Amino acid sequence: MILLEVNNRIIEEILTLKFENAAAGNKPEVVEVTFADFDGVLYHVSNPNGDKAKVMISISLKFYKELQEHGADEVLKNVYGNFLVAPESGYNVSLLYDLEALPSNKDSVIHQAGMLKRNCFASVFEKYFKFQEEGKEGEKRAVIHYREDETMYVEAKKDRVTVVFSTVFKDDDDVVIGKVFMQEFKEGRRASHTAPQVLFSHREPPLELKDTDAAVGDNIGYITFVLFPRHTSANARDNTINLIHTFRDYLHYHIKCSKAYIHTRMRAKTSDFLKVLNRARPDAEKKEMKTITGKTFAAR
């Protein structure tokens, strides 16, 4: 299985190139790039007001207001400090870098810029991990509509944090492959006693979402993670956040890869069958041709 990158490589490559050119004393060049990421996220890298010595990185998340309710602004301020500026029009968060005043810790700054989406997501997890750490129970469940028709729920108890993702399968084939994929997760947990508990329910939401407006349907699935203190501790939480916030994308990515692999195997097998059939086909019977006088035609 392939782990998706948590960071955004495009941002890191652009910023690395800009910093290297600035450090070498090269004349700055114009940058104007707009690109998308998972979950409907949109990035924009540009020179604000046409100033080539400045690089602005902006991100648009349709669900950012919901993240703000859980302290996203404070988390980003702690991570980015003075690089965080008023957001560009049409975007939720903007970072500004001055190529004439390069930071001493360039590698770290570049890496954190590439983690912008992840750090936006981190606020809701950090909040509920802290609730669990402090033994708080009964706090209102977090509900994040991270996609148009898909939702994430986070709830804290004294001994665990429960994270539930709802997801929509577009095809019947996706449901089948998704079930097999999730069964492998359950089997894999038996080999690792430190792994979180993973549950999958099809059509109906899990008991944790009882009496909510959680969607129900043949193409709806729910993935539940039960995170214990060993997963939410100060030493482990960063890695937990890295892995869990990309899980929905990870699942659907592997469903698509599985379908592509199956189709490739089917095409290869069909090609093999055609070769066998062609070899087994009998040669056409040669019909003897004669003239009216009884002479036989001979092929030249």
From Swiss-Prot:
SUPFAM superfamilies: Arp2/3 complex subunits. One of its GO terms (cellular component) is Arp2/3 protein complex. The keyword Cytoplasm applies. It holds the Pfam family P34-Arc. One of its GO terms (biological process) is actin filament polymerization. Keywords: Actin-binding, Cell projection, Cytoplasm, Cytoskeleton, Nucleus. It is found in: Cytoplasm, Cytoskeleton; Cell projection; Nucleus. Its main location: cytoplasm. InterPro entries: ARPC2, ARPC2/4. GO terms for molecular function: actin filament binding; structural constituent of cytoskeleton. Component of the Arp2/3 complex composed of actr2/arp2, actr3/arp3, arpc1 (arpc1a or arpc1b), arpc2, arpc3, arpc4 and arpc5. Belongs to the ARPC2 family. Actin-binding component of the Arp2/3 complex, a multiprotein complex that mediates actin polymerization upon stimulation by nucleation-promoting factor (NPF). The Arp2/3 complex mediates the formation of branched actin networks in the cytoplasm, providing the force for cell motility. In addition to its role in the cytoplasmic cytoskeleton, the Arp2/3 complex also promotes actin polymerization in the nucleus, thereby regulating gene transcription and repair of damaged DNA. This is Actin-related protein 2/3 complex subunit 2-B. It comes from Xenopus laevis.
